[in-house]
Structure formats: C-alpha cells, structure tokens
C-alpha cells in the first residue's frame, strides 16, 4: 500500500498557515496548496466578494467542495486551510481521515499584529478586531483541537523553527 503524505494546516487567521505551509512543502518536496487561493481562482473573484454576495454560509459551502475536490485529486500535499474551514463537520472528517492535521496555535495578540493591515479577511473588516478574534477563537479552538494530530505554538517562533517542529513530528509519526 502506498502511503500518502498529506499534511493539513489549520488554525486561526494570522497563525501563519500559508507562510509556514509554503516553507514546509519546500522542505518536504511536496506540493503546497492554499484552499483560499483555489477558491478565488475557481470563482474568479476574491473571498471578500464571495462573503458579500453569498454570506459566510455560501463561502463555507464552496470551501467544503473545494477541499473535497483537492483531496480527491491530489496526494502528497501540504494544504493550508482557511481559518473557518473546520466549522464544517464534513471538512473536519475529510481532513482527519486523509492525512496529518497540524494546528498552528496563535495568540490573539499575534493575530492582531499579523492581520492589522490585512484587508483580505472578510470577518475582520471592522475597526476593533479584538472582540471578533476572541469570539472566533472561543468558537473554533475546540474544533481545531478535536482534529489536530499535533498542536504547534507559533508565538515568538521563527518560520524555520515551526517547520522543523512539524517535520520532527511527521518523522516520529513515520509519515516521512
């Protein structure tokens, strides 16, 4: 039986899923995919536009479909998911059954710092992001933990350090 080396990065906005995912994929010589990028490319519009037109529910439906398509078509990938991808039970099930799930944990302070000038996050198009981030964390944290094979704290760590922690875990789990 051929083992697939699928690695799925989950976590809140600003945790570094895309940045870390690109470097992890490079180090492991795997393909990197960002589900948000795939959604935008497939729809021909940005995520903010989808949220404005279809709401979060419409976006989550598209996200679930895109992640299912990616997992049906690709193997040996590093997939960075959107921060809310885990809200959908079907997506959680897909991720946990098709590879190793890495939860990149980030503090509210980190998220604020990393998203302060970001306009591509529809749920953060508000003046005071802190209450929104706190609410999202309260809602999503248990879901992240419920499917995570490993939790990696990103606070104060370099991208290289985080990638090395994930690689070490994957070696220990004999996925590499």
Curated annotation (Swiss-Prot):
NCBIfam families tied to this protein: PRK05057.1
Source organism of the structure: Francisella tularensis subsp. tularensis (strain SCHU S4 / Schu 4)
Record: residues binding ATP: 14-19, 121
UniProtKB keywords: Amino-acid biosynthesis, Aromatic amino acid biosynthesis, ATP-binding, Cytoplasm, Kinase, Magnesium, Metal-binding, Nucleotide-binding, Transferase
Family: Belongs to the shikimate kinase family.
Enzyme Commission no: 2.7.1.71
Gene Ontology molecular-function annotations: ATP binding; ATP hydrolysis activity; magnesium ion binding; shikimate kinase activity
Catalysed reaction, written as an equation: shikimate + ATP = 3-phosphoshikimate + ADP + H(+)
Cofactor: Mg(2+)
Binding site for Mg(2+): 18
Primary location recorded for the protein, binned into one broad class: cytoplasm
Protein name, UniProt field: Shikimate kinase
InterPro entries: AAA+_ATPase, P-loop_NTPase, Shikimate/glucono_kinase, Shikimate_kinase/TSH1, Shikimate_kinase_CS
EC class of the enzyme, as a word: transferase
Keyword check for Lipid biosynthesis: no
Alphabetized Pfam families for the sequence: SKI
Residues annotated to bind substrate: 36, 60, 83, 140
Gene3D superfamilies: P-loop containing nucleotide triphosphate hydrolases
Subunit field text: Monomer.
Subcellular locations according to the entry: Cytoplasm
Purpose: Catalyzes the specific phosphorylation of the 3-hydroxyl group of shikimic acid using ATP as a cosubstrate.
């Amino acid at each position: 039986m051929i083992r697939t080396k699928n690695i799925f990065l989950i976590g809140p906005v600003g945790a570094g899923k895309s940045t870390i995912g690109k470097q992890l994929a490079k180090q492991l010589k795997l393909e990197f995919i960002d589900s948000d990028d795939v959604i935008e490319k497939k729809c021909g519009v940005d995520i903010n536009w989808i949220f404005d037109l279809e709401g979060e529910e419409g976006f989550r439906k598209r996200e679930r479909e895109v992640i299912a398509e990616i997992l049906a078509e690709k193997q040996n990938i590093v997939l960075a998911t959107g921060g809310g991808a885990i809200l959908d039970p079907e997506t959680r099930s897909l991720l946990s059954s098709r590879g190793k799930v890495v939860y990149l944990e980030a503090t509210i302070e980190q998220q604020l710092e990393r998203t302060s000038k970001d306009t591509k996050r529809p749920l953060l198009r508000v003046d005071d992001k802190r209450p929104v981030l706190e609410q999202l964390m309260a809602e999503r944290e248990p879901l992240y933990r419920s499917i995570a094979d490993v939790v990696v704290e990103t606070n104060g760590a370099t991208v290289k350090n985080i990638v090395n922690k994930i690689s070490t875990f994957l070696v220990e789990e004999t996925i590499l």
